[in-house]
Amino acid sequence: MQKHTKIKGFAKFRLIFILALMSSIAPLSTDMYLPALSQVKQSFETSEFLTQLSLASFFVAFALGQLIYGPLSDVFGRKIPALVGIFLFMLSSLFCVIIDNIYVFIILRFFEALGGCAGVVIARAIVNDLFELKEAASIFALMMVFSALAPMLSPSFGGFLIEYFSWHSIFATLFGLGILLFLLIFFALKESAPHLKRQKFSHKETLKNYRFVLKDKPFILYVSCASLVLAAMFAYITGSSFVFINFFGLSERDFGLLFGLNALGFVIFANINAKMVRKIDSEKILFYALIIMLISTLILFVNSLIKPNFWLFELSIFTSIALLGFIAPNTTTLAMARFKDHSGTASAVLGTSQFALAGVISFIVSAVGANTPVILALIMLICVVFANGVYFAMKK
């Protein structure tokens, strides 16, 4: 099988930049939009429910759309489906600027996500095409550093656009991002899977490939771990503002700084992981990171259950989120490495599983009202316990 492991220097930097940008479409399209929700509600003179539905429609399409692009990229190559998806994202973003109907806006957000998810699922497949295990783990870690910076900076940038322009400027910016990404993919990204046997796309063949991927026990192990620890992070993202502001009494400004600090922990650990995987096996890093995260969330829960101490709570949260910088890139690498000829399909299963479970956990956190430390800590602990349970049970 053809392997391109000699990509170095500027060519490698350019490739990582393009793939990281492709992977960051979701946080850029959602987190930059969050500060605009109230303004969108007023602009369309609509209800809060319909305004929130514009977010929900995006998440649903982003999760399900990956199941389409994965198999398509295994048949038609990576580049063409990526270009089609980004073009749809670009076009939908443009129409979001000019329409004046909330129902049309919700539909456009659906198609915006349906296009944007192509970048995420195909970026993972490209890394799997071009790099061997250790190098792939390093590349995934660097991509995730960029992806972690996006949610840190996007809300502030979105707030800036709203303050000086209007909510329409957010989608004008996303349209511009789409143009940039389309041009980069078209001119600077080579087809990474020319070795694939091109065949006519069929539903029967697609289902066959999905069955083939889902029968692989180690793949399911890594996907389950990746999805469960990411769900723990989404529980934190959904419930942390209520806990830190309403329970511990932090101001919105202080919470924003604390949220950024915790995200910085992820960035630092992912950078460390990018260097560690060149000398230490990904499986070994994952093994210890899962155990330490279990200990960290257990301390978080016990502290919350007895008498919540702010500094111990924050230290446990910081450690848990930072450890994702070890766990996320290594589970992704180990899962994707199982399938070199079905990278797109494998990436689709991984992405959809992560996004779907994260959505369910976020809904549970919102539904139960995780506005006290003990509830948030319990949900995070359950996710991490299951992640460890699945990992060690399937490793026997």
Where are the regions that the model predicts?
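Juxtamembrane intracellular "pre-TM" segments in multi-pass secondary transporters
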Residues: 2-9, 192-223
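Helix-breaking motifs and short loop linkers at transmembrane-helix boundaries and internal kinks
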Residues: 45, 77, 98-104, 115, ...
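Conserved MFS/SLC helix-loop-helix module at the cytosolic interface between two early adjacent transmembrane helices
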Residues: 64-103
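Paired small-residue
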Residues: 88-95, 103-111, 311-319
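Helix-loop-helix hairpin linking two adjacent transmembrane segments in secondary transporters
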Residues: 104, 142-187
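Cytoplasmic helix-loop-helix junction between adjacent transmembrane helices
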Residues: 108-149
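C-terminal transmembrane helical hairpin of 12-TM major facilitator-type secondary transporters
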Residues: 284-330
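A late C-terminal transmembrane helix in Major Facilitator Superfamily
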Residues: 334-370, 379-380
